[in-house]
């Protein structure tokens, strides 16, 4: 069963949008893409709330949990972890029920 993780977060003071996008790019290339069961990531930004959203898909909840344990100790995730306002981070982990795609 595919698992979707939705993370809402803010960055610490002084990090620009472009800088954070670069940090996330490094995280995806050097950390998430190497984790068992990782499928993909989307990054979104809410201007009015000054919040970032990361949507990820994983092959299983166990794969997601293993990667989540590693993110705080892996050197390839260090810049990402340091850039977050840790009190702002909120996560939802949900099983995919159905998907629809454009078939035209």
For the regions a protein language model found, what residue spans apply to each?
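Glycine-rich beta-strand-turn "strand-cap" elements at beta-sheet edges
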Residues: 1, 9-12, 42-49, 53, ...
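Short, surface-exposed ligand-recognition loops at beta-strand->loop->(often short) alpha-helix junctions
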Residues: 10-22
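Short alpha-helical
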Residues: 15, 49, 62
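Short, charged, solvent-exposed linker or helix-capping segments at domain edges/interfaces
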Residues: 18, 68, 103-104
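Residues in and immediately flanking transmembrane alpha helices
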Residues: 21, 53, 72-73
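Short amphipathic alpha-helical/adjacent loop interface patches that line ligand
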Residues: 24, 28
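An amphipathic, aromatic/His-enriched active-site/gating alpha helix that lines ligand/cofactor pockets
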Residues: 30-39, 57-92
């Amino acid at each position: 069963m595919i698992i979707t993780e939705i993370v809402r977060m803010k960055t610490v003071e002084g990090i620009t949008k472009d800088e954070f996008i670069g940090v996330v790019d490094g995280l995806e290339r050097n950390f998430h893409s190497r984790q068992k069961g990782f499928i993909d990531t989307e990054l979104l930004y809410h201007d009015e709330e000054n919040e970032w959203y990361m949507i990820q898909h994983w092959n299983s909840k166990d794969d997601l949990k293993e990667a989540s344990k590693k993110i705080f100790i892996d050197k390839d995730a260090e810049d990402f972890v340091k850039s977050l306002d840790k009190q702002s981070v909120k996560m939802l982990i949900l099983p995919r029920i159905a998907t629809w795609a454009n078939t035209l």
